Amino acid sequence: MTDTKALKSAIKNSGVSFTYLADTLGITRGALYKKLENVTEFKASEIVTLKNVLNLSNGQRDEIFFNEKVE
């Protein structure tokens, strides 16, 4: 399960808009919001794109997308 709180923080800190992210991922803003609310999951290719666009380290990526403990 995605740590959406950490992901939203990373998005905010990057200064990238949700519209830009959705366009870059090739999905609608609605689909992005569903992923940000853990209604649907991010695909592996989307995680790679987010890592690059948001300038995440491998550790940050792992904490956001692959951490077992999510509050």
Question: What name fits each language-model region?
Answer:
Residues 6-10, 14-15, 59-71:
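Short, charged recognition helix plus adjacent turn
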Residues 18, 29, 47:
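Helix-turn-helix DNA-binding elements, focusing on the entry/boundary residues of the two helices
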Residues 20-22:
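Short alpha-helical "recognition helix" segments of helix-turn-helix
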Residues 27-42:
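Recognition helix of helix-turn-helix/homeodomain-like DNA-binding domains
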Residues 45-60:
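DNA major-groove recognition helix of helix-turn-helix/homeodomain DNA-binding modules
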